[in-house]
Curated annotation (Swiss-Prot):
PANTHER family: 60S RIBOSOMAL PROTEIN L21. It is found in: Cytoplasm, Cytosol; Cytoplasm; Endoplasmic reticulum. The gene is rpl21. Belongs to the eukaryotic ribosomal protein eL21 family. Keywords: Cytoplasm, Endoplasmic reticulum, Ribonucleoprotein, Ribosomal protein. It holds the Pfam family Ribosomal_L21e. This is Large ribosomal subunit protein eL21. GO terms for biological process: translation. Component of the large ribosomal subunit. The ribosome is a large ribonucleoprotein complex responsible for the synthesis of proteins in the cell. GO terms for cellular component: cytosol; endoplasmic reticulum; ribonucleoprotein complex; ribosome. One of its GO terms (molecular function) is structural constituent of ribosome.
């Protein structure tokens, strides 16, 4: 998961992705794109 490469993801979003996993992973991808 190349989330670190983007670098545009806020820590709060990253932490949510790390905690919830796939569910918030979708929201994270939506934020990046």
């Amino acid at each position: 998961r190349p989330f670190r490469k983007h670098g545009a993801v806020p820590l709060s979003t990253y932490m949510r992705i790390y905690k919830k996993g796939d569910i918030v992973d979708i929201k994270g991808m939506g934020t990046i794109q």
